[in-house]
Swiss-Prot record:
Gene Ontology cellular component annotations, sorted alphabetically: ATAC complex; euchromatin; nucleus; SAGA-type complex
Task of the protein: May be part of several different complexes, including Gcn5-independent complexes involved in RNA polymerase II-dependent transcription.
Name of the protein: Transcriptional adapter 2A
Chain's gene name: Ada2a
Regulation: induction: Under heat shock conditions, strongly down-regulated in L2 stage larvae with levels remaining low during the L3 and pupal stages. In second instar larvae, down-regulated 1 hr after starvation and then appears to return to normal expression levels 4 hr after nutritional starvation.
Organism whose genome encodes this protein: Drosophila melanogaster
InterPro entries, per the entry: ADA2-like_ZZ (IPR041983), Ada2/TADA2 (IPR016827), Homeodomain-like_sf (IPR009057), SANT/Myb (IPR001005), SWIRM (IPR007526), TADA2A_B-like_dom (IPR055141), WH-like_DNA-bd_sf (IPR036388), Znf_ZZ (IPR000433)
């Protein structure tokens, strides 16, 4: 059917075009805006088109036959490509998963989601889509790389343009390929490159490819250990220390030599033994007795199944949370001990992992608790700074540095005060005149004894500029505990000073206090000997704790003390 002459379009003529009706309607609805700017020459004709529905309307359109013919050929090729055998799932294959823009190299491909593509802008902003997370491993897809080792001047972009141009222009049109490559390669070079790298199936042999997926995505191994690993697989060596530490775990079958609740099978053994005796007395039993016996046996089976389910539930928890390896488990637990204040509190909290099936969420919960603990300690440091009039972080650094210098100066002053009264010249003259080792004067010996005595342990102080402490008075220290110690926030000022002087951890002091107060509630009084019997620490520290609690009314002496 020719479009060079004016024709009146009817239903039969539209059917002869062999276009889909949707595409045909799209063509005719865009003719007005497309050809409105075309100059009207001597071949301008009239054209009438009809909509194929109950609201059919006729309109007069002016068109250029040459332009219309060219546009219809383009639409025919476009429609043929849309109706080709390309699956519908691949229509969005080259679009960004978040902003839906068309992708051009370079772009990002997720190596875990496999079908998620991102543009560089969305990737740099850390955007997520569907199951894709911004912490997944990724692959940079770019086409400015060299594909063939022997062709250093041909990039992947040039290879794609070459194949696409040959598909549209046909084999042998090397000039068109050279023009598509912006004359970067001569037609003879293009012909030589195609014959050397693509012709006759040599492409896969040059690149040593077996599957297109293997060039981007590594093969996934559905095993616990990698098949290509140089380390030997785990084996169940009964004599090894690792086997004993893992409670006899058999990795091949995923079970233990000594399973949990080893007496569960004894229920079935009791039933089997009883069943053997019942076979001998089966004739003498009544129907009621047989029903009762059967119900008892069913009850034993149900109890056995319940114990098996409990065993498998514990195995599942161990497998999900990775509790098989004892060394890793202990190191993992010790990582969060500080967040709970004590080992006992941490171990009690770990029992809640059985109600949290997702181990990642349980780890996130522990991390949040640890972060809460760190934030709590930081707030106490800021409270202490605010009490001393410090309002800025720069002032806090200056305060910590000056406080540390003041502590050191106070220690130096105390040490100097002990040695000022000693006459070094008198000591030197005595030893030079008396080399036989005779005892010196009483005053000199007493001073030497004072200098050589063991110094008392200094209180727990803040050092290194990392923590903050109170200002020191000229006569004594205003002691302060490290706020990071467990139980620090539960102490008042007097208890903090006691723990600092006695060098006690706040949580340990609270435990000792609870023991003594509990014993006081039982007996109505508390002796110092009873306190030393309950608290197995230094007797001097026990005396300090006892006197402190007695002074503040937490405990009382027996009536015989007067």
């Amino acid at each position: 059917m020719s479009f060079m002459n004016p024709v009146d379009m009817v239903d039969e003529d539209a059917a002869d075009l062999q276009f889909p009706k949707v595409a045909l309607l799209h063509i005719f609805t865009t003719l007005n805006c497309l050809f409105a700017v075309e100059p009207l020459g001597p071949q301008v004709k009239r054209f009438i088109h009809a909509h194929q529905n109950e609201h059919t309307r006729n309109s007069m359109v002016l068109y250029n036959p040459h332009t219309l013919h060219r546009y219809l050929e383009e639409m025919e090729e476009k429609t043929r490509d849309q109706n080709s055998s390309v699956p519908s799932a691949t229509k969005d294959a080259n679009r960004c998963a978040t902003c839906r823009c068309s992708l051009t190299e370079p772009y990002i491909k997720c190596s875990e989601c496999l079908d998620t593509l991102l543009c560089l802008q969305c990737f740099s902003r850390g955007k997520e889509a569907f199951s894709h997370r911004n912490n997944h491993a990724y692959i940079i897809v770019r086409d400015n790389i060299q594909v063939f080792a022997d062709e250093p001047h041909w990039t992947a972009r040039d290879e794609r343009i070459l194949l696409k141009t040959l598909r549209t222009h046909g084999y042998g049109n090397w000039e068109a390929v050279s023009q598509a490559l912006d004359q970067r390669h001569e037609p003879a070079e293009v012909r030589r490159h195609y014959h050397d790298c693509y012709f006759g199936g040599i492409f896969e042999r040059l690149l040593n490819l077996k599957h297109a997926r293997d060039s981007y995505v590594p093969e996934r191994m559905p095993y616990v250990f990698k098949m290509r690993s140089l380390d030997p697989p785990r084996h169940d060596d009964i004599a090894s220390m690792q086997f004993r530490l893992s409670a006899g775990y058999r990795c091949a079958r995923g079970d233990f030599d000594t399973p949990y609740d080893t007496s569960a099978e004894s229920l079935l053994s009791i039933m089997v033994d009883h069943r053997g005796r019942d076979d001998d007395n089966e004739a003498s039993e009544s129907e009621f007795e047989r029903e009762v016996t059967e119900e008892l046996q069913l009850g034993l089976v149900r109890a056995y199944n319940n114990r098996l389910r409990e065993r498998q539930r514990r195995y599942k928890i161990m497998r999900q949370h990775g509790l098989i390896m004892p060394n890793r488990t202990v190191s993992w637990i010790s990582k969060y001990v500080h967040a709970f204040g004590s080992d006992a509190s941490c171990m009690r909290f770990l029992g809640f992992m059985q109600i949290c099936p997702d181990p990642i969420k349980f780890d996130m919960l522990l991390e949040s608790l640890r972060y809460y603990r760190e934030l709590h300690s930081q707030l106490h440091k800021l409270y202490d700074l605010r009490e001393h009039g410090v309002r800025t972080l720069s002032g806090a650094k200056l305060y910590a540095r000056l406080s540390k210098e003041r502590q050191q100066a106070q220690r130096d002053y105390s040490r100097l005060k002990q040695t000022d009264a000693f006459d070094w010249q008198q000591l030197v003259q005595h030893y030079e005149s008396n080399r036989s080792g005779d005892p010196g004067p009483l005053a000199i010996n007493s001073k030497l004894y004072v200098m050589n005595t063991r110094r008392k342990a200094s209180p727990i102080e803040i050092g290194g500029g990392k923590h903050f402490t109170h200002c020191l008075t000229p006569t004594e220290y205003n002691f302060s505990l490290i706020p990071d110690l467990p139980g620090y926030s539960k102490l008042d000022d007097g208890e903090r000073k006691l723990c600092s002087v006695a060098r006690l951890v706040p949580q340990s002091y609270l435990d000792y206090k609870n023991q003594l107060v509990t014993e006081q509630a039982k007996l109505g009084y508390l002796r110092l000997a009873d306190a030393r019997r309950l608290i197995k620490i230094d007797v001097n520290k026990t005396r300090q704790i006892y006197d402190f609690l007695l002074e503040h009314g937490h405990i009382s002496r027996p009536p015989s003390y007067g």
